[in-house]
Amino acid sequence: MDSTKTNNKWAAAGILNSVGKDFVAGSVGGMSSIMAGHPFDTIKVMLQDASGNLPKFKNGFQALKYIMKVDGIKGIYRGLSVPLFSVSFTNSVFFATNNFCQSYFHPPCKDENGEDILIPYHKAAAAGAIAGGVISLLITPRDLVKSKLQVQCRPFGSTNVSLQYKGPIDVIRQTIKRDGIKGMFKGIRSTFCRDIPGDAVYFVVYEFMKRKLLALSKNNNNNNNNNDNNDNSSPKAGVPAWVAIGAGGCAGMSFWMSIYPMDVVKTRIQTQPDHLPPQYTSVLQTITKIYREEGISVFFRGFSATILRAFPTSAVNFLMYETTRNLLNSKDPFYNNNDHYNAE
């Protein structure tokens, strides 16, 4: 009985230790990816806009040209402060939730040969879906504020026209004053519809690509007879940088390819004018309305800018996450490579 209690205490301590690392690594990865991808995100939101503040753009280059003329370089970074200051928390929760669920669904174990038994893809999908649901609660208010700041713009050549919002705090203040606290969660259903399936795909693709790239790396090392100098021989080596970049970039592209139309729906709901009766009241009504009025192509408006952004931002996110986690593991005297997230 005493040994069982002791083992449970050690297991709980191990989980807390792992979650703590996820929070730190997720914070570093999230902030790095936001800095890399925000200009592309601004262009995407401008193309999806429903506020009426902007002209209709044919493509991302036209939107970029317009914002540079009107506001200069600062225009493409409008709304950056919102995700930059919040992403350290949201990305930490995202990775910590996913990894906790992976450990719950598939505790670390080895086969008869002493090799790690990797998490099945359906369990990785379930963990990613839960993480997507949790993170939706946190990012809906953030995306609402960010999107409203990104689409407000003075007409070209006009300097005397005042903007509706002075900054993130003003968006929050006006929204709560007008709609109450529930107004900050406008678009939450569409965010759930986007992130729950999207993040299931996200982590499955990451796991799949990581395993393929690690296997390729192992084969190359064996062929070159460099086993003595193989970085993977260290139990604390973790995921190599190039693997994190390749697998992370593919995961990011897969996420957007799987759910992009729902992102358009979310943006339409969140950027519609506040001073007018709402055009878009639900996910299904929004899909029906914009399809009837604008056709199927509207669901892919801004897709090119998003895909261009997806690979580098997700690659940076996973690179910094894995690098930070590897560093933390290397400083941890109790780490023994039984980490649930290590696919080696």
UniProtKB/Swiss-Prot annotation:
It is a multi-pass membrane protein. Keywords: Membrane, Mitochondrion, Mitochondrion inner membrane, Repeat, Transmembrane, Transmembrane helix, Transport. It comes from the Eukaryota. InterPro entries: Mit_carrier, Mitochondrial_Carrier, Mitochondrial_sb/sol_carrier, Mt_carrier_dom_sf. PROSITE patterns: SOLCAR (PS50920). One of its GO terms (biological process) is mitochondrial L-ornithine transmembrane transport. Residues 1-22, 97-116, 208-238, 322-344 are mitochondrial intermembrane. GO terms for molecular function: L-ornithine transmembrane transporter activity. Its main location: mitochondrion. Residues 44-75, 138-186, 260-301 are mitochondrial matrix. It is found in: Mitochondrion inner membrane. Disulfide bonds: none annotated. It holds the Pfam family Mito_carr. Solcar repeats lie at residues 17-104, 119-212, 239-327. The chain crosses the membrane at residues 23-43, 76-96, 117-137, 187-207, 239-259, 302-321. The keyword Aminoacyl-tRNA synthetase does not apply. One of its GO terms (cellular component) is mitochondrion. Belongs to the mitochondrial carrier (TC 2.A.29) family. Calcium-dependent mitochondrial solute carrier. Mitochondrial solute carriers shuttle metabolites, nucleotides, and cofactors through the mitochondrial inner membrane. This is Mitochondrial substrate carrier family protein D. The gene is mcfD.
